[in-house]
């Protein structure tokens, strides 16, 4: 039904040209898609080698078409968080606007709060409306110009119409042993990203590469960040509160238990804080990639 919906929109819905920004970091796009490269994996149930693919979430600068950050895996809040975190930690800039679709984890309160922190304006597009997101157009060209050269290229997604967008599946299935492992395939993809970023931008009259365009220019609407500001951006505030107990501050996330005590300047347990706050509930601010410490926030 989804592909029929796409075809209907392409045929009958009015099309609006997207006016792209003239400067990098004015607008970032984020989207999840199938990573169109096969890798070999062992099927334990059927005791045989099989060809598989995975998904990737990419963040792209709309002006330069520079790929800024990625995360391997299905589109959800975790992959969104990891990809945008990579983009901001690498380039240390807060874009003016971010556009995503309405799929994945964007509707979760924690996701909405996260996107509100990392840009000045966050918008979503309609699902399955390819023309509304320039990243899908760029990713199509990325596949055609770079990824298709690899022997384990799967062909583009089912909505692609060009014959060159598809590959001989039978040939690949007969040669599964020649496919790369998952880690080797990920390295292939990262090399493809590097090639794309170092290619000339299609609208540059001087042959400026995407990387050169992105690193040379910058939008006055974007905000430069230092190391501390970047770290603070990625701390999340827990949705639920936790009661401080005799054992300290104890909670579970993703089926893993975490225990914390509050210490004074000498490195000893702060008994004054401990005695005063047993039974008091706090929300906590945490870094999902560094759980060595958390901040307690009064409810």
Predicted regions, residues:
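Globin-like tetrapyrrole-binding proteins
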Residues: 6, 96, 102-225
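Short, surface-exposed connector motifs at secondary-structure boundaries
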Residues: 64-67, 91-97
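Mobile-element integrase/transposase regions
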Residues: 1-55, 66, 83
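C-terminal, beta-rich DNA-binding module of retroviral/retroelements integrases
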Residues: 38, 186-299
């Amino acid at each position: 039904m989804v592909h029929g919906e796409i075809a209907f929109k392409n045929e009958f819905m009015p099309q609006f040209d997207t006016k792209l920004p003239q400067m990098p970091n004015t607008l970032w796009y984020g989207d999840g898609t199938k990573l169109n490269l096969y890798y070999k994996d062992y099927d334990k149930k059927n005791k045989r080698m099989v060809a598989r693919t995975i998904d990737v979430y990419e963040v792209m600068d709309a002006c330069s078409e520079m790929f800024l950050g990625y995360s391997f895996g299905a589109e959800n809040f975790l992959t969104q968080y990891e990809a945008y975190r990579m983009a901001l930690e690498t380039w240390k800039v807060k874009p003016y606007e971010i556009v995503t679709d309405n799929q994945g984890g964007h509707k979760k309160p924690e996701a909405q709060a996260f996107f509100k922190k990392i840009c000045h304006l966050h918008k979503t597009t309609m699902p399955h409306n390819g023309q509304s997101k320039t990243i899908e157009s760029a990713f199509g060209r990325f596949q055609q110009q770079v990824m298709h050269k690899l022997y384990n290229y799967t062909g583009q997604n089912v909505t692609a119409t060009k014959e060159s967008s598809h590959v001989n599946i039978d040939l690949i299935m007969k040669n599964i042993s020649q496919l790369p492992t998952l880690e080797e395939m990920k390295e292939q993809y990262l090399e493809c990203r590097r090639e794309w970023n170092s290619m000339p931008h299609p609208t540059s009259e001087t042959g400026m590469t995407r990387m050169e365009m992105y690193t040379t220019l910058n939008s006055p609407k974007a905000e430069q960040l230092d190391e501390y500001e970047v770290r603070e951006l990625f701390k999340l505030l827990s949705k639920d509160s936790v009661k401080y107990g005799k054992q300290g501050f104890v909670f579970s996330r993703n089926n893993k238990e975490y225990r914390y005590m509050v210490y004074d300047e000498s490195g000893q347990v702060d008994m004054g804080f401990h005695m005063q706050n047993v039974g008091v509930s706090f929300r906590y601010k945490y870094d999902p990639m560094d759980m060595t410490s958390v901040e307690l926030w009064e409810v």
